[in-house]
Amino acid sequence: MAHISQISSFLSIVLIFLALCITLFTNPTLSLPALKLNPFQDFCVADLQATPTNSGYPCKSQVTSEDFFYSGLNTPLNTSNPKGIAANPANLLTFPGLNTLGISMYNVAIAPGGYNQPHSHPGVTEAGVVIEGSVLVGFLTTNYTLYSKVIGPGDMFVIPPGLIHYEGNVGKTQCRLLTVVADDLPSEVGVPHTLLATKPAIPNEVLISAFKADSKTINMLRSKFTA
């Protein structure tokens, strides 16, 4: 009976996540910024062997069923790194069938005490569901309000377009979550690196004024980041 219960629980999580993906994909408000499909095309599987242009990759001339299926999310994840986080992406570059469809998916694992640094995805929504463990999810609004909560298996979250957010493992075992972003190849802007690892560097005077800190502190912070 316990085995049947586990299967039922997993299927429930998968169904919830599929509903989430459908919502992101079909809601014009959420997916329109990333939707680049020609209205006269059913799809445009990217030809990654071709040279991309400003409009992206051209469509493959020959398409098979295999172009619309992907197993890469199941690859084992290793969180033995300084950030304690690892992810398998299903995006335009790993799954060319997503080209122009305005969606990508990620299998994410976070070690106990690990955090995905504060970051944003300009112009697009992110949402996800926890598969295992306890995850602290938070995002900041443009009026400096923090919304956050610790969530567990089967719980979902959503990050409004472009807002700074983070995820962290606050449990005692590795956590795992599936996330979906409303872009086939979303950009990511990490807050610490954006401020401390630019080339050329932001003048110390600017950061001293922003953080109310001295030059020694700013230089110490810079030393911990590379572009």
From Swiss-Prot:
Its main location: secreted. GO terms for molecular function: manganese ion binding. GO terms for cellular component: apoplast. Disulfide bonds join 44-59. Residues 71-219 form the Cupin type-1 domain. May play a role in plant defense. Probably has no oxalate oxidase activity even if the active site is conserved. It holds the Pfam family Cupin_1. InterPro entries: Cupin_1, Germin, RmlC-like_jellyroll, RmlC_Cupin_sf. The lineage of its organism: Eukaryota, Viridiplantae, Streptophyta, Embryophyta, Tracheophyta. This is Germin-like protein subfamily T member 3. Keywords: Apoplast, Disulfide bond, Glycoprotein, Manganese, Metal-binding, Secreted, Signal. Oligomer (believed to be a pentamer but probably hexamer). It comes from Arabidopsis thaliana (Mouse-ear cress). Mn(2+) binds at residues 119, 121, 126, 165. Belongs to the germin family. SUPFAM superfamilies: RmlC-like cupins (SSF51182). Residues 1-26 form the signal peptide. Glycans are attached at residues 78, 143. It is found in: Secreted, Extracellular space, Apoplast.
